[in-house]
Swiss-Prot record:
It comes from Hylobates lar. Heterotetramer of two delta chains and two alpha chains. It holds the Pfam family Globin. Belongs to the globin family. One of its GO terms (molecular function) is organic acid binding. This is Hemoglobin subunit delta. InterPro entries: Globin (IPR000971), Globin-like_sf (IPR009050), Globin/Proto (IPR012292), Hemoglobin_b (IPR002337), Hemoglobin_oxygen_transport (IPR050056). The lineage of its organism: Eukaryota, Metazoa, Chordata, Craniata, Vertebrata. PROSITE patterns: GLOBIN. The gene is HBD.
Length: 147
């Protein structure tokens, strides 16, 4: 559960309505893989991840980033039940994929940076603070099955 004020909810949803999920998803996942290269081990089947340009141009990275942001969108629609919303994904990432739950926090922070880059002055400190709460809540929900 994420505790947002009514103003924060409005700001989060207003900005999210302008997000190009395809582009932002691919950019966020790509930047995660570039900045934190050890996360690439979970994506060995994606082909060439040998350089930042290869990662950022990789169609499988872009497609999976879109999928990730689709799940994030679902979370935004269910902020009062994030653990329930992400229960199956948490189980998959914990039991089958064995993803370090810290990676969820890293991806959330990268997403905030990508949103700031894409929205500039529209991504005010207040909007950033609200998004930090959301990505922390999503990361916590995804890590739930690890506890």
């Amino acid at each position: 559960m994420v505790h947002l004020t009514p103003e924060e909810k409005t700001a989060v949803n207003a900005l999210w309505g302008k997000v190009n999920v395809d582009a932002v998803g691919g950019e966020a996942l790509g930047r995660l893989l570039v900045v934190y290269p050890w996360t690439q081990r979970f994506f060995e089947s994606f082909g060439d991840l040998s350089s930042p340009d290869a990662v950022m141009g990789n169609p499988k990275v872009k497609a999976h980033g879109k999928k990730v942001l689709g799940a994030f969108s679902d979370g935004l629609a269910h902020l009062d039940n994030l653990k329930g919303t992400f229960s199956q994904l948490s189980e998959l990432h914990c039991d089958k994929l064995h993803v370090d739950p810290e990676n969820f926090r890293l991806l959330g922070n990268v997403l905030v940076c990508v949103l700031a880059r894409n929205f500039g002055k529209e991504f005010t400190p207040q909007v950033q603070a609200a998004y930090q709460k959301v990505v922390a809540g999503v990361a916590n929900a995804l890590a739930h099955k690890y506890h």
